[in-house]
A protein has these predicted regions:
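A short small-residue
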Residues: 2-5, 78, 115-116, 151-156
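Short beta-strand elements in bilobed, periplasmic/extracellular small-molecule ligand-binding domains
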Residues: 34-38, 144-154
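N-terminal beta1-alpha1-beta2 submodule of the flavodoxin-like/Rossmannoid cofactor-binding fold
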Residues: 1-104
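Short, glycine-/small-residue-rich phosphate/pyrophosphate-handling segment
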Residues: 92, 105-149
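Short secondary-structure transition/capping segments
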Residues: 79-92, 126-135, 154-156
Length: 156
């Protein structure tokens, strides 16, 4: 059994990317895995201020909902991100969370598998490429992990 965290980054109620996140979570549960589905909707996530205190102390000085999410990511075997595509890129809230998880960088982490679920109004093959590239930049900082899959649902 693996520990799976699915992070839905859309703030819109009933969003397409949240629907994908729910289905991924249901599939993982049906396969016998322990799943935590986290929606950023309603969460307080402030911007990184670039102070780098986290690199010295191992903790971010900003008080909001990020530390709890980060702890779940650190302890997960699988991380799945779900995001709408805005201007051919991941959502701003996803990027903000990734930036804030800078405190994870020097820590031990369990995740080896990362998945990406994306949705967009446009349906062309190139639409999700920059979002994937942005996430791959984060994954590259965690050498034991890799992008195992990306599902794009366009035209929605």
């Amino acid at each position: 059994m693996k520990k799976v965290i699915v992070i839905s980054t859309s703030l819109r109620p009933g969003s397409n990317s949240y629907a994908m996140a729910e289905q991924f979570a249901k599939g993982a549960e049906a396969a016998g895995h322990q799943v935590e589905l986290v929606s950023l909707r309603g969460k307080e996530i402030k911007f990184c201020i670039g102070c780098l205190s986290c690199q010295k102390t191992g903790a971010c000085v900003i008080k909001d909902d990020v530390p709890a999410i980060m702890e779940s990511v650190l302890n997960a075997d699988v991380v799945c991100w779900a995001t709408p595509i805005y201007y051919y890129e991941m959502s701003g809230q996803m990027k903000t969370l990734i930036d804030r998880m800078n405190a994870m960088y020097p820590k031990d982490y369990k995740f080896r598998e990362v998945y990406l679920l994306t949705t967009a109004a446009e349906n062309e093959e190139f639409v999700p490429k920059r979002a994937e590239s942005g996430l791959t930049g984060w994954i590259d900082c965690y050498g034991k992990s890799e992008l195992k899959g990306h599902i794009f649902c366009g035209g929605v």
